[in-house]
């Protein structure tokens, strides 16, 4: 799910945009899939836990429709309707019996969850998707044409010198459309996940955190609390999957949910988000690292230890103190996120979310100058600013995967007119309220308006 800069007005789907897309799609797929038909998109594994179905099939549909150049709001609305229809049906025909090996495990070790056949479920879902598209070709519901704020988001990610790309990111401007929220508050969600020990945990988090957030009762009243709980619940879900499939990976993560004139962020580990306002860095969060005294004390109180090797590590292994996954390092590596909220005044320039492959070599105070310099050279275009920031980190010696996402909160041309360069090393820590609250292997560059 990728996309993009807010304008002063909302965006509504053009009169012919939705029917035109549906006409083209249904020309290529004129009938539901038969049992012999190949699936048009990759299936998410061989089995799914019942609680995983909504998020995994949502990801499948958004990937498929995005590959067909569906407008993001249209893809989200169609996906939501198809998911809603599927979840009202009896899914018991897709139940899979446990493997013999799992049956023989000790009772206390057994992962008790209903497993469903992913391929059969995906085929049934594609046919729900086809049915919705056929219905909407005749008449598009008004809910699918609801206004959506326009965004400019610049994203760039590289594998760098690492053997595998373990980062994942999410850019979801059509949050309301995807989850059927019909109130007057515009919502957009952005996230970066930095995996380690494999990509499974990062991919899982990029699929499930926002879906879990959408189901939290606090989403409408306390969005930061909803994000915090979404991280915790996603960690619990992934730990079940990890035990079932013998996965050992983990992921840090950071996300931002913009709800009208408010910003809510949540984070786990050392991925970070900063806000730049009138050329000044506004500190929103403190990353979780083993060397932080409070983190070190928490780990030691649980019976673990923090040691300095090439860097500070938990129990001599992991260089992060909080993460989704890392099943064999729980509870020392915590799955409890922190969160914060702040009101937006309209003077904010942009958000920047990135993994430690960027922030380890590019200090916060340099970012406004780097972005401003890019905008000057590009005459106010911010489309490729993330690519330049990634290049800066790589040239400074970062060997890690690098992902950078810049979410503009004002038109980049306005930032040039206002001289948003920042004052050297100035950094503000303004009013943050702490609350209890598909990639290519080598590189991805996504910069678009939506």
Swiss-Prot record:
Residues noted as binding Mn(2+) 2 in the record, renumbered to the chain: 194, 356, 400
Biased amino acid composition, Polar residues: 433-450
Subunit (UniProt): Associates with FEM1B.
Function per UniProt: Dephosphorylates and concomitantly deactivates CaM-kinase II activated upon autophosphorylation, and CaM-kinases IV and I activated upon phosphorylation by CaM-kinase kinase. Promotes apoptosis.
Gene3D superfamilies from the UniProt entry: PPM-type phosphatase domain (3.60.40.10)
Protein's recorded name: Protein phosphatase 1F
Gene: Ppm1f
CDD domains (alphabetical): PP2Cc
Keywords noted in UniProt: Apoptosis, Hydrolase, Magnesium, Manganese, Metal-binding, Phosphoprotein, Protein phosphatase
Manganese as UniProt keyword: yes
Superkingdom field: Eukaryota
Keyword Hydrolase attached: yes
Species name: Rattus norvegicus
